UniProtKB/Swiss-Prot annotation:
Lineage: Eukaryota, Fungi, Dikarya, Ascomycota, Pezizomycotina
Organism encoding this protein: Cochliobolus carbonum
Domain of life: Eukaryota
Pfam families documented for this protein: Glyco_hydro_7
Protein name as annotated: Exoglucanase 1
Keyword terms, alphabetized: Carbohydrate metabolism, Cellulose degradation, Glycoprotein, Glycosidase, Hydrolase, Polysaccharide degradation, Signal
Amino acid sequence: MYRTLAFASLSLYGAARAQQVGTSTAENHPKLTWQTCTGTGGTNCSNKSGSVVLDSNWRWAHNVGGYTNCYTGNSWSTQYCPDGDSCTKNCAIDGADYSGTYGITTSNNALSLKFVTKGSFSSNIGSRTYLMETDTKYQMFNLINKEFTFDVDVSKLPCGLNGALYFVEMAADGGIGKGNNKAGAKYGTGYCDSQCPHDIKFINGKANVEGWNPSDADPNGGAGKIGACCPEMDIWEANSISTAYTPHPCRGVGLQECSDAASCGDGSNRYDGQCDKDGCDFNSYRMGVKDFYGPGATLDTTKKMTVITQFLGSGSSLSEIKRFYVQNGKVYKNSQSAVAGVTGNSITESFCTAQKKAFGDTSSFAALGGLNEMGASLARGHVLIMSLWGDHAVNMLWLDSTYPTDADPSKPGAARGTCPTTSGKPEDVEKNSPDATVVFSNIKFGPIGSTFAQPA
């Protein structure tokens, strides 16, 4: 996946991350019920009362005690942010109007994320949310020898969008107390992922002002010198055309800063960095089964479906990541690979080795420890993220089209979906599909076989 400068937000005040706490708007997390399960068959599940919080990147950042922007469009205030330390002390982030400004709503066990939300004075694009355990702490998950299940409706997600559900090794408290971070998880701080994103405006309690370059493609985004790297488990990256699940191991524990092209894996240094940016992905279309997922396919994306992901292993060891689906009461095993030289319908070390060879891809997955390193990270605990985003880097073509765009679509691994190579430009999607929405619901978590009736 290529989550580079992908998250855009435009509000009346100009979105930004800051580490002090403002007082203009109260922060009230939307409630979300989910379940933990025991036994087998999905019949013994108990409700858990949780909530979601909006990532701090989308929030209004202003001077402490005032109403002047610390970040406007895609540039920092020279008055309040002449350097990283000053900016962090001078600027505060505020509470969020979840539905009115950001298009985020919950109802019992369902979370709905709307792509474009237009208010009286503002427009917001996309969102990223985290599941909370308490008002000040993210819910942590250890996925080893467990399964994670949810329902999803992608029927309103066209080419170029990604309704994503994934896990990253963030701090449970959002890094509160690091540097000048006084906001913490309550305000959605501490993000990192395997793309070592440079668009994170505050990292470890310090503003990412040094070397900040406003994006030419994204009117709200930019890139600072520092990247925020950490292991990532993509359970679900999808629209109505294509879907993939992908482990991304990294070196180190939790959020690791990178500050040069090599360690960040930027540009031509993609395979030199501390994280596996490509990951080992399972996309049924890319694996040669073109009628398994999509509108009217075996898994019909015009209708809601249940997604089950199992993490086979013990302790900190991970041996296999399996996938099942349920739709219209029928259980479907994941599609088998139809690529010559690659067998299986799950992610294992042997599958990843064979797939990289068949596709001619560089395997930073193996170089960075593969499933062993991914398992160690998962055992340390991950935060659940649910988001909706458009891709300012490569228009989501890596997920739903032919990529690279100049590749022969008949070459193994090049075709990932049926979207045209000209599709997915964020400005086009924002204009043509402003009502695009993803709904995640009915989250269940427990031992293998506890969340659904698993076939023999």
